[in-house]
Regions:
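Extracellular/periplasmic carbohydrate-active domains that bind, remodel
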Residues: 1-445
Length: 445
């Protein structure tokens, strides 16, 4: 059955609050047993819309939703820094099944207008970021919590106030042929955040954003119970951002496993592939990480990466003198058939108390370019700086590895192309690595 939002009071005039009309159409569709809620061409002003089970929200070509969301405090949440409201969204749902957002329309979060102050001229933690958000942004512009059989397909997603799509505790999710356009200098405008979800397929997405493009996390504290993030598959995507093209870990204590990424192009990202195991009992934003995620059984194949840094793997404590041990891990991770153009060396770092497990690299070509200083030539700091390393020139080796059990490089190569200054011809430097098989050829052009 088809339910036209304009028949329920929605007005395509870009000013009238059409939330009641949209919600009435969604509720009527659900009450009838499900179907399609149709959004005809035109501009609609919308506040928070909650989808129901068995409802597809379909945008006809020329249809556009523009956000009316405002900062709303999340009850019981205290934070010292600007943070987000995890219980508000523009379009989403909680504990629903068989729901979808589809069509050739546009969804505009108006993050710049509604949630960001003027350019303050400072450089914030992310590469090139110039804006710092207000408190209480909706964390996910499109958000689904503890739901199953969810689809988001074909729509153009613009200017989110925080994450563009956030799925937490969901099963059977498909994100297909999405176009994401978020301000490259905006704060925390991740594109696709997959958090404690299983059986997720991401394909054909074209992304530009001001934080991570694809982030796989396991924030069981936010979810409220232990649930792994597993069986995540991303392919045939184009990524551009001011942080990480693909990020695994950081927020969360749950397992991240059986994740696969293939046939992806990254163009001008800060870090190509980031993996992070951290503990942070309270970082001031409400994020609680007690022991760190266990990241295992993941593969990266046939990726083209243009990045400031190709790989950055970290084990971190916040604060650095936190007495609790890191018990999370990275193990059984495979990188195969990768081509990387990078302007500083990659960091593969465990911690003295918790080493990286097995990393396997096969047929990985790392091209290094640009002028390299001597900031880290004599001494690489520990902990290695994460977001604030931009003031230094970086690592002069293609790979720097410390505190790891087993690293294997098969048929890999390093090409120094228009690489000046203090680049080292030695392709890898290791510290406290139990085993390193380094079949890495080096060529200078």
């Amino acid at each position: 059955m088809m339910f036209d939002v304009t028949k329920y009071g929605a007005a395509a005039d870009d000013s009238t609050d059409s939330t009641p009309g949209f919600q009435a159409a969604v509720d009527a569709c659900a009450a009838a047993g499900g179907g399609v809620v149709d959004v005809p061409a035109g501009k609609y002003a919308l506040d928070m819309l909650s989808l129901r089970s068995n409802v597809e929200l379909h945008f006809e070509e020329g249809a556009e939703v523009r956000s009316l969301l405002k900062p709303v405090p999340q009850p019981g949440l205290k934070a010292k820094e600007p943070t987000a409201n995890t219980r508000r969204w523009l379009i989403g749902g909680e504990k629903i099944a068989n729901a979808a957002v589809t069509g050739k329309g546009r969804i505009d979060g108006r993050g710049f207008e509604l949630f960001w102050p003027e350019n303050d001229g400072l450089e914030h933690p992310l590469y090139g970021q110039r804006y710092w958000p207000q408190l209480h942004r909706p964390r996910g512009m499109i958000c689904f919590r503890e739901s199953r059989n969810i689809r988001v397909e074909d729509v153009l997603l613009l200017d989110p106030p925080c994450y563009t799509v956030w799925c937490l505790g969901c099963d059977d999710v498909r994100l297909e042929n999405l176009i994401v356009r978020a301000d490259l200098k905006g704060p925390n405008t991740d594109a696709l955040d997959i958090d404690c979800c299983s059986n997720v397929h991401i394909t054909g997405c074209d992304i530009e954003c001001g934080d991570d493009c694809i982030a796989v996390k396991s924030d069981i504290n936010d979810l409220g119970y232990d649930k792994p993030c597993e069986s995540v598959h991303a392919e045939h995507c184009r990524l551009r951002c001011t942080s990480c093209g693909i990020r695994l870990g950081y927020e969360g204590d749950g397992a991240i496993r059986n994740c696969h990424f293939n046939d992806i192009v990254m163009d001008e990202v800060m870090i190509g592939i980031s993996m992070m195991v951290a503990i942070s009992p309270d970082d001031g934003r409400g994020t609680i990480i007690r022991h760190g995620p266990r990241i295992t059984d993941c593969t990266f194949e046939r990726l083209d990466i243009h990045a400031l840094q190709g790989f950055n793997f970290q084990f971190l404590k916040n604060p650095e003198d936190c007495p609790d041990p890191i018990t999370g891990c990275m193990d059984d991770i495979v990188f195969r058939d990768l081509r990387i153009l990078s302007h500083r060396g990659s960091y593969l770092g465990g911690s003295p108390e918790t080493k990286i497990g097995k990393l396997y690299f096969e047929n990985v070509t790392m091209t290094l370019s640009g002028n390299m200083g001597r900031d880290f030539a004599e001494h690489v700091p520990y902990p290695y700086p994460v977001w604030n390393d931009l003031k230094w020139s970086g690592l002069p080796w293609a790979y720097y590895a410390r505190h790891a059990e087993s690293l294997t490089f098969r048929n890999c190569s390093v090409i120094l192309d228009r690489a000046f200054g203090s680049w080292e011809r030695e392709p890898i430097r290791t510290e406290n690595v139990a085993e390193c098989i380094a079949d890495i050829g080096t060529t200078r052009i």
